[in-house]
Amino acid sequence: KMLTSRTLHGVMQNIRDIVNLKKSEFWNKGGPAWQKIAVCLVFDGIDPCDKDTLDVLATIGIYQDGVMKKDVDGKETIAHIFEYTTQLSVTANQQLIRPHDDGPSTLPPVQMMFCLKQKNSKKINSHRWLFNAFGRILNPEICILLDAGTKPGHKSLLALWEAFYNDKDLGGSCGEIHAMLGKGWKNLINPLVA
């Protein structure tokens, strides 16, 4: 739950940075910027899914426990899809962040789709769900893939988007990953981080 919360809260902060842009030929035309962004979560199987993570998703409104069916009209369910627009976020420390005013520090509405696959079919199958299912319907300009636990830096998603927007011949891009060193670099004591 901490890893998913860290990533989702970082994404929502990045969307806030995009919404707060004052000068933009793309984001400020044809409606609010947040309406041009969709966050898709794909979880690989109900059984391996951490129940505390589902509680976090229920807290922000994207998951509803008790509405899933194992089969419909005798056919086994392949995936459960939830859709919701929320301004709620949960930090990695499990603090609930709510909208407080219309100021620049308030998180904007974020359109979310959550696909919980019935069976664990591995990561590549999850990518296929994103590109073949959601991608065909949404027809996005770009897709940014993040693993749970990855915290996008300040304006990092905007920087990735700008790379594609400014170069129509660009086919792929990647960000830079930094280890989270912790306060006073205390995480360097852990040999896996160091």
Curated annotation (Swiss-Prot):
What compartments host this protein?
Cell membrane
What this protein is called in its record is Chitin synthase 2
- E.C. no: 2.4.1.16
> What GO terms are given for molecular function?
chitin synthase activity
- Name the membrane topology term: Multi-pass membrane protein
- Which UniProt keywords are listed? Cell membrane, Cell wall biogenesis/degradation, Glycosyltransferase, Membrane, Transferase, Transmembrane
- Any one cellular-component term (Gene Ontology): cell septum
Top enzyme category: transferase
